[in-house]
Amino acid sequence: MTELKNDRYLRALLRQPVDVTPVWMMRQAGRYLPEYKATRAQAGDFMSLCKNAELACEVTLQPLRRYPLDAAILFSDILTIPDAMGLGLYFEAGEGPRFTSPVKSKADVDKLPIPDPEQELGYVMNAVRTIRRELKGEVPLIGFSGSPWTLATYMVEGGSSKAFTVIKKMMYAEPQALHALLDKLAKSVTLYLNAQIKAGAQSVMIFDTWGGVLTGRDYQQFSLYYMHKIVDGLLRENEGRRVPVTLFTKGGGQWLEAMAETGCDALGLDWTTDIADARRRVGNKVALQGNMDPSMLYASAPRIEEEVATILAGFGQGEGHVFNLGHGIHQDVDPEHAGVFVEAVHRLSAPYHQ
């Protein structure tokens, strides 16, 4: 494989010295970029874009052509695993993802296969290999998956949800059925992420988008327990260097200590968590990623720079910070504002690394 020219993102995740704080953006390949919209139109629809390795590679690289980002993230979707399990994923205009065959019972869980990452999910591995080839060692490639709990919410609810009553009903009335589903998903995610690593992903991230809707006790039992199982089963070295793992529970700032005990390398923070407080609590154990409010990108350039400066000062001197948004970039953000953000992180962070 090609020698990595810029490894500051990987170094920061391992709390090693860097020259400036590395930065990337969740959903950096996305609808805020006109070139993304053009490629998506060419593909026909979202899943066709994910399943075409050349086009998935193209949209992965688009933000890197505009901005000096320190990492690329695989262009894919968290719902690839449930789709490969045969639930019939489709997208409804204005409604988001839906499944034709949601999981309603233990019998439904028992029928679900564990997908072979190189067969049913081979299109994802093809995309990883294509992107690695085209990156030519410029920056590392991040692979990812949804967490078992987050995937289960979509599979049981039949799509997106606001109140999560269907899955919570299963959790409280039929906990064995939900545990069986989460266990199957944990095995599937472990295989899926390890296949991404073997295909060339140099770091992986687990997105627990809906962990924050749980009580503390339920979070431990139904979300964190299964992410811990995945971390335990991951390949932690490939191509002669460590493959860092980042866990991100949106709305999970109160559980950072428990998350840091999983053996992951880094924790993602959303914008509701104070980064100085997070560093005091777990900074001696894990790196931190985050955590500007994505809506700040609607602000003026000076206001964006001020916010970047505030977050950098909050983290303070030294290593172990990857700058990011606290969640995905919004689709109607001006691309120039994203450029202001990336440039400000590099310029304003240099003094913190001297």
From Swiss-Prot:
Q: What is its EC number?
A: 4.1.1.37
Q: What keywords were assigned to this record?
A: Cytoplasm, Decarboxylase, Lyase, Porphyrin biosynthesis
Identify the Pfam families for this entry.
Answer: URO-D
> Broadest EC class?
lyase
Which CDD domains would you find in this protein's record?
Answer: URO-D (cd00717)
The family note in this entry says: Belongs to the uroporphyrinogen decarboxylase family.
Which PANTHER family does the UniProt record give?
METHYLTETRAHYDROFOLATE:HOMOCYSTEINE METHYLTRANSFERASE RELATED, UROPORPHYRINOGEN DECARBOXYLASE
Task: Spell out the subunit comment.
Answer: Homodimer.
What this chain does, per the entry, is described as: Catalyzes the decarboxylation of four acetate groups of uroporphyrinogen-III to yield coproporphyrinogen-III.
Q: Which NCBIfam families did the record assign?
A: hemE
Q: What is this protein called?
A: Uroporphyrinogen decarboxylase
